[in-house]
């Protein structure tokens, strides 16, 4: 390891790097043995040259003592997960190497049994439906989605969060639940939608606190909210909880907008306020569900990437995400002032002035710049959800002249600019630290739109 970085990396990553620097004589898995199998042939050598020796050297069995078993929660692996829990404000963290689909199923399996009532955000990911309904045979009550006229999903419709109605639905489906203080074992809420809206976790907690034992916030499309002053208050992990509140589980797709390899995910558990109560989910129960769903042959670099994500966010998170949000605002302004046919989804007029005429710092300091709706009744309808500053949803029907978003998507991709997704008249761009250099490359193509 380079002298200037030695001792500055988190424990699991440093141990892994040190291990790969030593000559190994493995008689265990994986069979490529640090790439040696591939290097027996010219074609294999081309393969290892492309990826680099470190990728193969770091792919090792968990049979050895160093750097330890990533699934054990002990030693350097345990220290890595503790770092993530501390960084994100949780009591415990589990690193999951097979995506948030698996993380969601783990949480459902840990909490739900046959005929338990589960309150489901209708916009839940399929993994939630699989875990809660197919695997656990729980009974669902769905919360309707709030949709814009062009089909964009903006979160849960607050009218479906009526406690009296939800208790009535629970009693209709499971009559004996009428006598329970909290009829629902679990509620599942999408913290951030794929269309670029973020829920106010404090509002959700206030509406559901008397109804359920636990809330699972599926934050697959979030995770950075607590590192931005604008969105910090929206995070479930910044909430101060009492024994009157549900326990919280948060799943995050670290690979989506955070710093992780594809498939890396984490489960964050915040429920120490329930310890000793009957509704408390013991760590070992969640761990058993975790062990049921993971591979016994983990890819160590994936685990290391999750540790590095926590390490970087703990040390630099606020600065990096503030810079990313600043870039996202500047890009929105550039599109609004340069483009004729496309526009980012935003409240266009704020206190009588166009959105883009305000300073970037002011836009990033006040929620009103991110509250969807122009009229008072419209704003009230969306008051519990906010436009995500780090997701730019472009609409291709500016000034009432719609054209297929796919045309713009293909045009941009020909110029090596790749949107996250494309709808009929919308394009989604994800913004994260490191994107600032893209501004100069995207300016000219978008100017023509």
Identify the residue ranges that each predicted region occupies.
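Short, surface-exposed ligand-recognition loops at beta-strand->loop->(often short) alpha-helix junctions
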Residues: 395-402
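N-terminal glycine-rich, Lys/His-bearing helix-loop that initiates the first secondary-structure elements
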Residues: 1-54
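Single conserved hydrophobic/aromatic residue that forms the stacking wall/gate
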Residues: 440-449
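Short amphipathic alpha-helix segments
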Residues: 402-412
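Structural motif of enzymes handling amino- and sulfur-group chemistry
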Residues: 285-393, 425-426
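Conserved PLP cofactor-binding pocket of PLP-dependent enzymes
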Residues: 413-428
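Conserved PLP-enzyme active-site core in the AAT-like
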Residues: 12, 72, 100-113, 117-336
